[in-house]
Amino acid sequence: MTIVVGFEGSANKIGVGIIQDGKVLSNPRRTYITPPGQGFMPSDTARHHRSCILDVLQEALEESNIKPEDVDCVAYTKGPGMGAPLLSVAIVARTVAQLWKKPLLGVNHCIGHIEMGRLITGAENPTVLYVSGGNTQVIAYSERCYRIFGETIDIAVGNCLDRFARVLKISNDPSPGYNIEQMAKKGKKFVELPYTVKGMDVSFSGILSYIEDMSHKMLSSGECTPEDLCFSLQETLFSMLVEITERAMAHCGSQEVLIVGGVGCNVRLQEMMGVMCEERGAKIFATDERFCIDNGAMIAQAGWEMFRAGQVTNLQDSWITQRYRTDEVEVTWRD
């Protein structure tokens, strides 16, 4: 029996999760929410995390009925992410590991998403679409590495959605992406937007610039509604993602797709990916908001896999990094 506590705080979510041999014992989190039209600053986000991380840890321990002496390892997000929030959480994880006299493990944020998705859905060897506010990658496992076959060449798909939400002054509660999804369901007119796919890579900065420039004119003239723009943006972005995922599946000979990351909660994205998979005779796997959105349990699960494979992070090496690519990690726990 192996129990791992995981700390996640790479962006505006702070979470602590506890995993015991593939079972999620607890997974509380808090979200830093800013007013409509605003993003979240690293310093303010870090301040939020510092103010509530111990309460979240206490909640996780109480919910799981786990005591410090029961824990085998403490895992934390090493990166990628926002520097100040990452550092705040890493300091707490280091302190907890020393107080409890437990080994420490630095975990790649993306690997956490993948391993949590595999655990929850039962996907065996899928092509992974990782879509969030900071990342957009198409990934597949090969020779002890999660290899990136396609990715954004500029901004992430979630960042594109978030920044457009600011243009329309859409609420950030519970998240701008979720609120865009709800508005898109009411859209009736499709507005043609730039579509940029280069092989298995995508670009979202052009479509964002275009819709930012044109939205005021379109809305003021009555040419379309905010709901129409949300609908059009979603359809265009998600079509691009489905295209590069299918291309990666064909390249890898894969019959499974796993969608992870915060944008992976979007039901419309899952529907569009499902249509493609059905036409290919493939299976689609996705999780709900409990595990798609950043959470501590995913870091605990990746830490559990790493710890069982004999990995630990020395205290002097327990730094954080804002840039930490998925394919930099040697996946020692898979055949």
Curated annotation (Swiss-Prot):
Top EC category: transferase
CDD domains: ASKHA_NBD_OSGEP_like_euk
Location of this chain's protein in the cell: Cytoplasm; Nucleus
Coiled-coil ranges (or none): none
Pfam family, one: TsaD
Subunit text: Component of the EKC/KEOPS complex composed of at least tp53rk, tprkb, osgep and lage3; the whole complex dimerizes.
Protein name: tRNA N6-adenosine threonylcarbamoyltransferase
